[in-house]
């Protein structure tokens, strides 16, 4: 009988080693709600764009279609990035952290990733006990969602 693959075993793997996705997929660590945090990063600039949640079906759809799909906790439904705004994310690479409990999505983002119209959701920095806004919207959010 073969031993089940674990993320702990992957720690000992060497660069270039490959493992069957079906075996790895069984070890992904979802939270009690069946979700895993997914961080989207622009593949070429490496700018961190956003963090959202995926469930197993959203992860599978993303891998199959190449377009990023998340799970919306507030709407309790699938959220295919760009469905309403047209600002899609095309998957370039998908990586798990060492524990298998977080995902890094390297994406090609069309336009802003943030619902505020900014390229990144991470536009507020804290310095000297002050919250400083780092960027302006590149698209008016009203125009972005045609409200």
From Swiss-Prot:
Residues that coordinate or bind Zn(2+): 98, 114, 121
Cellular component aspect of the GO annotation: cytoplasm
The protein's annotated pathway: Amino-acid biosynthesis; L-histidine biosynthesis; L-histidine from 5-phospho-alpha-D-ribose 1-diphosphate: step 3/9
Claim: Transmembrane helix is one of the keywords in the record: no
One example GO MF annotation: magnesium ion binding
Name this polypeptide is given: Phosphoribosyl-AMP cyclohydrolase
Organism of origin: Hydrogenovibrio crunogenus (strain DSM 25203 / XCL-2) (Thiomicrospira crunogena)
Localization, UniProt: Cytoplasm
Pfam families from the UniProt entry: PRA-CH
């Amino acid at each position: 009988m073969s031993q089940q693959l674990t993320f702990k075993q992957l720690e000992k793997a060497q660069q270039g080693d490959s493992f069957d996705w079906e075996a790895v997929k069984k070890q992904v660590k979802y939270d009690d709600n069946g979700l895993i945090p997914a961080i989207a990063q622009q593949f070429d600039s490496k700018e961190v764009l956003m963090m959202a949640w995926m469930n197993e079906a959203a992860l599978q759809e993303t891998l199959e279609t190449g377009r990023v799909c998340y799970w919306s906790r507030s709407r309790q439904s699938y959220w295919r990035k760009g469905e309403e705004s047209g600002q899609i994310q095309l998957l370039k690479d998908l990586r798990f952290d060492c524990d298998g409990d977080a995902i890094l999505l390297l994406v090609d983002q069309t336009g802003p990733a943030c619902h505020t119209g900014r390229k990144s959701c991470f536009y507020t920095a804290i310095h000297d006990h002050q919250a400083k806004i780092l960027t302006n919207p590149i698209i008016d959010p009203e125009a972005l969602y045609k409200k």
